[in-house]
Amino acid sequence: MKLYSKYRIRIFFVILLIVLVFGIIFLRSIPSFGIKFNENNNLMNYLKISDEIYYRQTLNNCAPYAVMGIINILTGEIKDPEMLARETKWRIIKNLTFPQGLIDLLHKNNIKTKEYSLKIYSNNERIIWLKNQIDNRNPIILLVKVKNIQHYFTVIGYDKNGFMLYDSLQEKQNENTRKTIIDKKEYMGNRYYTNNEIINLWNDGGYKIFFKNWAVVCGKT
């Protein structure tokens, strides 16, 4: 009888865990309603980031590398991305990181966050929204799909035609394979995407119906 009771308790906790995990994922599939857009953007705006941290990521470690970029932008601190990778939770096979792992790592490093899902908005509204966050001095991490791979990168600035990023999947330098090349040396960040390029990558990101057009806006605590 006692064994039967223990079995039922275990089953209960397994079901509860499944419900909690599904709840966390499901809530993030709900669109962010009521977003206000300010179309009076600057021609150009950006947040400062150290060019010393334009590292090329190790296998599937885009989440901790994106967090490294956020920490540097908001605090000026240079963190070891591999140390951040070791601290990252919510990981599955081959180091793939669920958004909750990204959020937890940001919180652990005293970065406040707010999540959004912009799947119900137009592409133009998404572009305006990204610019609004930069104008508010808040960097953003987006979940995108690059060459059939789910990927996180950090948006740090914009001009009229596109966006400046720190992207740990940028091509490696020939002379130092731990560092990446830089698309536009006169800009902040190591990667530049046109408006259409970044929106297409963002639209393709997410897992089926979950985390579509998902973003996390970051700020100082």
Model-derived segments and their meaning:
Residues 63-71, 81, 85, 99-103, ...:
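Extracytoplasmic/secreted envelope proteins and their assembly/folding machinery
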Residues 90-109:
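Short, surface-exposed acidic-centric catalytic microdomains
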Residues 28-32, 92-93, 135, 158-221:
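Noncatalytic regulatory segments and standalone regulatory/sensor domains
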Residues 115-116:
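A structural preference for short, hydrophobic beta-strand core positions in alpha/beta folds
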Residues 3-95, 146, 159, 219-220:
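Active-site-adjacent structural segments surrounding the nucleophilic cysteine of cysteine proteases
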Residues 73, 87, 105, 133, ...:
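Residues that form generic nucleotide/phosphate-binding pockets
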Residues 121-170:
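Active-site-adjacent substructure of cysteine-protease-like catalytic cores
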Residues 76, 111-112, 139:
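Short aromatic/hydrophobic-glycine micro-motifs
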